[in-house]
Amino acid sequence: MRRIFVQNRELVVPGTLLAQGPYKNGRGTFKEGSRIYSTVIGLVDIKGNTIRVIPLEGPYIPEVGDNVLGKIVDVKFSSWTVDIGSPYSATLKIQDYTDEKIDLLRTDLRKFFDIGDIIYAKVKGINEVNNIELTTKGMPFNGGPLRGGQIIKITSSKVPRVIGKGGSMINMIKKLTQSRIIVGQNGWIWISSKNPELEKLAIEAILKIERESHTRGLTDRIKNMLLSKLQELKERGVIEEIPSLEEETQEETVMENDVEARGP
């Protein structure tokens, strides 16, 4: 028998029967015979033959392929230690940053990334003791460091809601607030705008999404909130015109594709 008993993105509790048959069980589930059950309160995530449950609360648990934002907390001889908001240690080795041959005896790695720098990386591997290996190769902005802007942190399980279907929610926020935004699957979000008031508005919108992520009609509420706040800013002379959702730059297109690829 091959059957899935739940819908994708359905809220489930521990012990919920998710599927039966030749499916693979991912995080937040366990398998008993041919049946897969949930072990946490969370949202069902079905990808191909793999079924997992994304917890509604709790720390970020990384998976290989995740794109994350992180903060450099230590610089070593040939690597950096990175805080990604996980219970486990994350490391970026020099060979996972560049293919260039580096003379480590003569080179201080702080010339590339220093303590406190924010980087954008991909989870390359996780070993048997949960040490996390990162890579910045092929990442937008070459991994960073990301200059200016602000970092906000939300529960990682709320990231899909912030991104929206096909990147719809985050792209709406980016366009209306004219902000550059990078969303990490660990729940860390980098926001930067030339206008401090618009940057503040983007942050307000994202935090509202986190608070109301379980509710219906959220996209319309966020849109209406943004347009209302933008009208106030226009009346105060902070902005000249309310940005159009139809406008799109080449850079936004690149970022939209990147955001869409990160959606779970």
From Swiss-Prot:
PANTHER family the record matches: EXOSOME COMPLEX COMPONENT RRP4 (PTHR21321:SF4), PNAS-3 RELATED (PTHR21321)
Name of the molecule in the record: Exosome complex component Rrp4
Domain S1 motif: 65-137
Organism: Pyrococcus furiosus (strain ATCC 43587 / DSM 3638 / JCM 8422 / Vc1)
Residue ranges of domain KH in the record: 147-206
Upper classification of the organism: Archaea, Methanobacteriati, Methanobacteriota, Thermococci, Thermococcales
InterPro entries, per database record: Exosome_RNA_bind1/RRP40/RRP4, KH_dom, KH_dom_type_1, KH_dom_type_1_sf, NA-bd_OB-fold, Rrp4, RRP4_N, RRP4_S1
Family indicated by similarity: Belongs to the RRP4 family.
Biased composition annotated in UniProt, kind: Acidic residues: 244-258
